[in-house]
A protein has these predicted regions:
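Carbohydrate transferase catalytic cores enriched for Leloir-type hexosyltransferases
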Residues: 3-394
Length: 394
């Protein structure tokens, strides 16, 4: 027979096990750490780091502070740096969507799963998935047929089994339409440009590219149909100012988009992929940032430009207007002549004015990774799919 002391110890252990079993367990889909860095992967990384900071400082609902947190990653994943509350765990042997649907699904079983980069296990029920836009439904001309078929199917299946979140009011309405969802059921958890706060500009790139400060226009983005670099290049050619070249920063992605890169021509400086320190320097020294996207779910690069007080000449796409408001000048992204005229106006205006800078600061203050992470934690603190009429957790 157990002594009173031993019985008490066993009772305590049993209660501890029961308490641990009752704790909320949350898993983050870390597949984005194996992907090339675009706005989607940037979003996922910054949200994870900001959530970790809030959890470490005690700024979350009690059940989330007491919860077990982990980010599940495939083999060969990059690192996020030091995380204080979220444990990193490598799982599985597969890659890509197979890892999502098999390895991750198995490892995340019984936990609340957060997928921040457009896809995740379609059979996992307690699941929050951030889908950043509705491009695969609205602009089929941007993608290969194989990519369209896969991602449309994923989107429709996830809409049935998971809570869908997104990054803007525009994207919420688009996704609600194509996925037959109530817009009020889709939380909005936006992007930010705060990641550049820790980036020290490396101005050596100005000399390396043989540029004159404040005498060049800047495009930053992938060479894809959606990013519409062709219009920017045609506008620069029609501008006819060799002393104000267009610097094109970014890489290609033919595998996904079936081709879309444009060849270099006169007055164009093709810089290729650059590290953040060089991009920051170009933002800080450009005459203006040109953003001709045909379709966006949010539009991070204009905010990044504003962070360095760079004037923004942006596409009139709805999500871009939502993000930039009156802190940018707009043009029809299909009209190279209109963009060329806006570039000429910027040359005539010269450096950014105090009023323009004030408008930029107002837009930047609207968006914060910490605010977005707090919104994410608010949603995660509630039962799955329990979303209020304004798109926030109830």
């Amino acid at each position: 027979m157990l002594s009173l002391k031993a019985a008490f110890a066993q009772h305590t252990r049993n209660n501890t096990r029961k308490e641990k079993a009752r704790l909320l367990k949350l898993s983050i889909n870390g597949r984005f750490l194996t992907q090339s860095l675009t706005g989607v992967q940037r979003y996922a990384a910054e949200i994870v780091k900001a959530m970790d900071g809030l959890l470490a400082s005690g700024n979350a609902a009690p059940q989330l502070l007491d919860a077990e947190w982990q980010i599940l990653v495939p083999p060969a994943a990059t690192t996020l740096g030091e995380l204080r509350r979220i444990k990193v765990k490598q799982v599985g042997t597969l890659q890509g969507h197979a890892w999502d649907q098999i390895d991750l699904a198995r490892a995340a079983a019984g936990t609340r799963l957060i997928s921040l980069a457009n896809s995740g296990p379609v059979l996992h029920r307690d699941h929050l998935v951030v889908i950043h836009d509705a491009q695969v439904f609205k602009r089929r001309d941007f993608f290969s047929r194989k990519y369209l078929a896969l991602h449309r199917t994923l989107g429709r299946l996830l809409a049935r089994t998971a809570t869908i979140a997104t990054v803007s009011t525009f994207s919420r309405n688009e996704l609600a339409s194509v996925l037959a969802l109530d817009p009020a059921s889709i939380p909005i958890i936006p992007n930010s440009a705060e990641h550049f706060a820790s980036v020290e500009p490396d101005f050596s790139i100005i000399e390396s590219l043989r540029l004159e400060p404040h005498r060049f226009f800047l495009f930053v983005g992938s060479m894809t149909k959606n990013k519409n670099v062709d219009t920017a290049i045609r506008a620069a050619e029609r501008l006819g100012r060799a002393d104000f070249p267009l610097v094109v920063v970014g890489g290609d992605n033919d595998k996904v988009f079936g081709g879309g890169a444009t060849q270099s021509s006169g007055g164009i400086v093709r810089a290729g992929r650059l590290k953040d320190e060089h991009v920051a320097a170009l933002f800080a020294r450009a005459a203006a940032f040109v953003f001709p996207s045909l379709y966006e779910g949010f539009g991070i690069p204009p905010l990044e430009a504003m962070y360095f007080a760079c004037p923004v000449i942006a596409s009139s796409a709805a999500a871009v207007r939502e993000t930039c408001a009156d802190a940018a000048v707009y043009f029809d992204p299909l009209d190279a002549d209109e963009l060329s005229a806006k570039m000429r106006e910027r040359i005539d205006l010269g450096r950014i004015s105090p009023l323009e800078q004030a408008k930029q600061r107002e837009r930047l203050a609207t968006y914060s990774w910490t605010k977005s992470a707090a919104a994410m934690l608010q949603v995660l603190a509630k039962p799955v799919r329990q979303i209020g009429p304004d798109g926030t957790a109830r």
